[in-house]
Amino acid sequence: MILLVDAGNTNIVLGVHNGERYIASWRISSEGNKTSDEYGIQVMQLFNLSDIDPKNITGVIVSSVVPNIMHSLENMLRKCFCHEPIIVGPGVKTGINIKYDNPREVGADRIVNAVAAYEIYKRPVIIIDFGTATTFCAVRANGDYLGGCICPGIRISADALFERAAKLPRVELEVPKNMICKNTVSSMQSGIIFGYIGQVEYIVKKMKQEMKNSKYKEEPFVLATGGLANLIAKETDVIDKVDSDLTLEGLKILYEKNKEIEISQR
C-alpha cells in the first residue's frame, strides 16, 4: 500500500493505492505556516476516518510546487509512516526526455502529469492542468517533453478582479446562461468563464499548430486535469478527455520506477 502526496499552492491531495485501486483520497489546505505535528494530526485523522492502518503503508512519494511547506511535510511523513519519502525532482527516474532549456525549472506537477500521460495514453498529448496556475504541456508520443505555457488560474483571475476593482464583488465560479448578462455578478462570471474558455481554445490551437508544423508532425490528444477541468471541458470541444486522477496516477508510476531509492534509504 503506497501513499501518494501532491502538494499544490492551494491544496495538498493525498491518495492511498493498495496495488489494485485507490482505496482513499483526501484534500487538505497547504497553508505555509503549519507544523509537522499539525499536518500529522490532520492526516492521521483522515486515515482513522477511512479505517486505514498507517502501518500498512509501505512507501511514500511526494510531488510539491510549494518549497516552504516541504520541511514540515517531509518530517510529518517520516514520523507518521516510518518511511523516507521519495521527492519528485532531480535524480528521480521519469522515463521521459525533458526538452526544456533548463530541465530543473520544470515544476514537479508538470513532470508527474507528463509521465502519466506518456505511460497511460502512449500518444502525443497536450495536458492542461487547471490548478492555482493553469499549465499547458506538450508531450510527444516518444516521451519527449517539449514544454508549454503557464497562465494565471481561473480563481486567481476572479480574485484579482475582486481585489483590484473596488465596486466588484467576489463571485462563485459558475457558467452563466448567457454571454450578454444583465447584472454585475453574471456579467463577471461571463467575462471570467467565457474569457478563460477563449484563452484555452486559442492556446490549444496554437500548440497544435506548432506540434503539427514541426518536424514531428503530430496530432495531439488534449487531456485536462485539475479541480476546474470539468467546468471548462463542458463548455468547449477542444478538450478530448478529463482525467481527474492524472497526477496521482503519475505519482504511482514514478513510485514504481524509483522505489529502490526509498528501499536504499531505510
Swiss-Prot record:
<comment type="function">
    <text>Catalyzes the phosphorylation of pantothenate (Pan), the first step in CoA biosynthesis.</text>
</comment>
<feature type="binding site">
    <location>
        <position position="100"/>
    </location>
    <ligand>
        <name>substrate</name>
    </ligand>
</feature>
<dbReference type="GO" id="GO:0005737">
    <property type="term" value="C:cytoplasm"/>
</dbReference>
<dbReference type="GO" id="GO:0046872">
    <property type="term" value="F:metal ion binding"/>
</dbReference>
<feature type="binding site">
    <location>
        <position position="132"/>
    </location>
    <ligand>
        <name>ATP</name>
    </ligand>
</feature>
<dbReference type="Pfam" id="PF03309">
    <property type="entry name" value="Pan_kinase"/>
</dbReference>
<keyword id="KW-0067">ATP-binding</keyword>
<keyword id="KW-0547">Nucleotide-binding</keyword>
<feature type="binding site">
    <location>
        <begin position="107"/>
        <end position="110"/>
    </location>
    <ligand>
        <name>substrate</name>
    </ligand>
</feature>
<dbReference type="InterPro" id="IPR043129">
    <property type="entry name" value="ATPase_NBD"/>
</dbReference>
<feature type="binding site">
    <location>
        <position position="184"/>
    </location>
    <ligand>
        <name>substrate</name>
    </ligand>
</feature>
<comment type="subunit">
    <text>Homodimer.</text>
</comment>
<keyword id="KW-0479">Metal-binding</keyword>
<dbReference type="GO" id="GO:0015937">
    <property type="term" value="P:coenzyme A biosynthetic process"/>
</dbReference>
<comment type="similarity">
    <text>Belongs to the type III pantothenate kinase family.</text>
</comment>
<comment type="pathway">
    <text>Cofactor biosynthesis; coenzyme A biosynthesis; CoA from (R)-pantothenate: step 1/5.</text>
</comment>
<keyword id="KW-0418">Kinase</keyword>
<protein>
    <recommendedName>
        <fullName>Type III pantothenate kinase</fullName>
        <ecNumber>2.7.1.33</ecNumber>
    </recommendedName>
</protein>
<keyword id="KW-0963">Cytoplasm</keyword>
<dbReference type="GO" id="GO:0005524">
    <property type="term" value="F:ATP binding"/>
</dbReference>
<feature type="binding site">
    <location>
        <begin position="6"/>
        <end position="13"/>
    </location>
    <ligand>
        <name>ATP</name>
    </ligand>
</feature>
<keyword id="KW-0173">Coenzyme A biosynthesis</keyword>
<keyword id="KW-0630">Potassium</keyword>
<keyword id="KW-0808">Transferase</keyword>
<feature type="binding site">
    <location>
        <position position="129"/>
    </location>
    <ligand>
        <name>K(+)</name>
    </ligand>
</feature>
<dbReference type="GO" id="GO:0004594">
    <property type="term" value="F:pantothenate kinase activity"/>
</dbReference>
<dbReference type="InterPro" id="IPR004619">
    <property type="entry name" value="Type_III_PanK"/>
</dbReference>
<feature type="active site" description="Proton acceptor">
    <location>
        <position position="109"/>
    </location>
</feature>
